[in-house]
């Protein structure tokens, strides 16, 4: 998200162009079902319990680009008779994560005993361990369900302050937390309703936030 928002001239064409390319090939070669990986950013500011049919009002460029990808998916589906599913993950983290994403960044600071900077520690994110996200996406791809959207998340949002405190506790760090206020780049978020995925896909996240963070920390230690 950050890359697209900071460099939209290059970032937006990659998101939309890649999606269009994949959709064209999916239609051209008779793909059984196209699964589009969108983002919770398409909702913009949202509260706990947000469902898939809730209003989509992105507050940043990345969210708008992903929402455009959703619209393109539906247009190709209507034009070419392509079955599709839209998956909206949130705050995915875990082994192999990019270093500038929030969980990776907090771990890096904690391991180095450096201050962890928050942009509004009360803002929440429905952090989802990567194995749960992958599990949900595979469930969606292999299901007989088509032509709808799913929130694939942990279904339990956590504040950035709690995230930082938990990482400090897991790592035994001496880091201090500094809250410098809200960034306009990111929306106010909460818990996404995953009942549709539970009912139709039998999706059930397996990792609590702490379990996911501990697993990620084990991986980071072995990597170091």
Predicted regions and their residues:
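NAD(P)H-binding glycine-rich loop region in Rossmannoid oxidoreductase-like domains
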Residues: 1-14
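Glycine/proline-rich active-site loop of Rossmann-fold NAD(P)-dependent oxidoreductases
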Residues: 67, 92-105, 112-114, 130-131, ...
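A conserved pocket-lining segment of Rossmann-fold NAD(P)-dependent short-chain dehydrogenase/reductase
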Residues: 4-5, 84-91, 106-128, 151-153
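Conserved Rossmann-fold NAD(P)-dependent oxidoreductase catalytic core, especially the SDR/UDP-sugar
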Residues: 20-61
């Amino acid at each position: 998200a950050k890359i697209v928002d900071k460099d939209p001239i290059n970032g937006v064409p990659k998101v939309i162009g890649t999606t269009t390319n994949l959709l064209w090939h999916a239609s051209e070669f008779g793909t059984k079902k196209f699964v589009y990986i969108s983002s919770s950013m398409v909702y913009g500011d949202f509260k706990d319990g947000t469902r898939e049919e809730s209003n989509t009002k992105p507050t940043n460029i990345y969210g708008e680009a992903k929402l455009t990808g959703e619209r393109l998916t539906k247009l190709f589906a209507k034009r070419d008779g392509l079955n599709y599913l839209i998956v909206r993950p949130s705050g995915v983290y875990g082994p192999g994560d990019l270093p500038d994403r929030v969980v990776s960044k907090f771990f890096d600071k904690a391991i180095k005993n450096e201050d962890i900077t928050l942009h509004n520690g009360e803002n929440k994110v429905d952090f989802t361990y990567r194995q749960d996200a992958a599990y949900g996406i595979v469930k969606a791809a292999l299901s007989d369900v088509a032509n709808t959207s799913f929130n694939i998340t942990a279904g339990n949002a956590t504040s950035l302050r709690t995230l930082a405190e938990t990482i400090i506790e897991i790592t035994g760090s001496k880091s201090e937390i500094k809250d410098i206020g809200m960034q306009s780049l990111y929306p106010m978020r909460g818990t996404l309703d995953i009942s549709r995925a539970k009912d139709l896909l039998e999706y059930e996240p397996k990792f609590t936030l702490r379990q996911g963070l501990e697993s990620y920390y084990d991986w980071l230690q072995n990597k170091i």
